[in-house]
Amino acid sequence: SNGCPRRRGRQTYTRFQTLELEKEFHFNHYLTRRRRIEIAHALCLTERQIKIWFQNRRMKLKKELRAVKEINEQARREREEQDRMKQQQQEKQAKLE
């Protein structure tokens, strides 16, 4: 090897660890160093693992929010299109009367 520590495999967390991390994230999207140390000790994980879990979780949240926004915009476009069609329909009807 070239002296670099080999990259670790993917960390798998126990259900308990995940639940505790999610609970913490629910109250705080960012951790103080002090809190990170506390959680690391409580869950038998390293500070680095906690830090990276939170980074990944914030990214996941950002992606989810982006997806919701996209769905809402799509729905709005469809509503506007339907309103336009309805409007045209009514105008056509008015001409016939």
Curated annotation (Swiss-Prot):
Keyword annotations of the record: Developmental protein, DNA-binding, Homeobox, Nucleus
DNA-binding region: 6-65
GO biological process: anterior/posterior pattern specification; negative regulation of transcription by RNA polymerase II
Pfam families: Abdominal-A, Homeodomain
SUPFAM superfamilies xref list: Homeodomain-like
Annotated region (Disordered), positions in chain: 73-97
Keyword Nucleus listed: yes
InterPro entries reported for this sequence: Abdominal-A, Antp_homeobox, HD, HD_metazoa, Homeobox_CS, Homeodomain-like_sf
Molecular-function GO terms, alphabetical: DNA-binding transcription factor activity, RNA polymerase II-specific; RNA polymerase II cis-regulatory region sequence-specific DNA binding
One CC-aspect GO term: nucleus
Annotated localization: Nucleus
Skewed-composition ranges (Basic and acidic residues): 73-86
Function: Sequence-specific transcription factor which is part of a developmental regulatory system that provides cells with specific positional identities on the anterior-posterior axis. Required for segmental identity of the first through tenth abdominal segments.
PANTHER family membership: HOMEOBOX PROTEIN ABDOMINAL-A, HOMEOBOX PROTEIN HOX
Family, similarity comment: Belongs to the Antp homeobox family.
Protein name per its UniProtKB record: Homeobox protein abdominal-A homolog
Gene that encodes the chain: ABD-A
